[in-house]
A protein has these predicted regions:
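C-terminal transmembrane helix-loop-helix hairpin of multi-pass membrane proteins
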Residues: 1-77, 90-176
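A short small-residue
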Residues: 80-81
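Alpha-helical transmembrane segments and their helix-helix packing motifs
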Residues: 84-87
Length: 176
C-alpha cells in the first residue's frame, strides 16, 4: 500500500496544488484493492436493535478516536487523545468534540447502536474537527465550523456507508 500511495500522492500534489489532500491518496489506493475483493458484497446490514451498555455509550467517542488508526478500543482512543493533547490541548478538544458530535449525529439519524459503540460514526467527524483546529485561527467561527463540519461529515458517512456498502460492496473509509 505505501509503495503505491507515494506516486498517487505525487500525482495528487501536481493536480491539487496547495489544496490539502488529507487521506485522498489512502482512499484511492485502498479502495482500488477493496474493489477487487468487495468484502461487503452480500453482507447483512447491522441489526439496529442491538443494544449496547451505558459504559459503551460513554466510551464510544474514545473508540471513535481509536478507529482513526483502525483500533476498536476506548483505552487506545484515550491514549491517542492524550498524545494529541500533549501536542495541542486545543487540537485534542476539537478531536473529542468531533467524535462526540459524530456519535450524536449517528444517534439522531438512527444508526445501529453497535456501529456507534464501535466508533464507526466518530472517526471521520473527529478528523474533520481536528483539521479545522489545525488550519483555522481559534475563535467562534472556527468552533462553529468544526461543529458543523463534524455533523456534516457524520451525515455524509451515514449515506456513503449505505451506498458504498450496499451498491459497491466496499466500506466508505475516510471519504466523507
Amino acid at each position: 500500500g505505501a509503495a503505491v500511495s507515494a506516486p498517487v500522492v505525487g500525482a495528487l500534489k501536481a493536480a491539487c496544488g496547495n489544496v490539502p489532500q488529507f487521506t485522498l491518496a489512502f482512499n484511492i489506493c485502498t479502495l482500488s484493492a477493496l474493489f477487487a475483493v468487495r468484502p461487503l458484497a452480500g453482507a447483512a446490514p447491522a441489526d439496529p436493535a442491538t443494544a449496547i451498555s451505558a459504559m459503551e455509550w460513554i466510551c464510544s467517542p474514545l473508540v471513535g478516536i481509536s478507529q482513526i488508526f483502525v483500533v476498536n478500543d476506548a483505552i487506545s482512543g484515550a491514549l491517542i487523545l492524550g498524545a494529541i493533547g500533549m501536542y495541542s490541548p486545543m487540537c485534542a478538544a476539537h478531536t473529542l468534540l468531533g467524535s462526540c458530535i459524530g456519535v450524536g449525529t449517528g444517534l439522531a439519524l438512527g444508526a445501529p447502536a453497535a456501529e456507534l459503540g464501535m466508533g464507526l460514526w466518530g472517526f471521520n467527524p473527529a478528523l474533520t474537527a481536528l483539521s479545522v483546529s489545525v488550519f483555522f485561527v481559534p475563535g467562534m467561527p472556527s468552533y462553529a465550523l468544526a461543529t458543523g463540519g463534524a455533523a456534516a461529515t457524520a451525515a455524509l458517512f451515514g449515506g456513503a456507508k449505505v451506498a458504498m456498502g450496499t451498491a459497491l460492496g466496499v466500506p466508505a473509509l475516510t471519504l466523507p
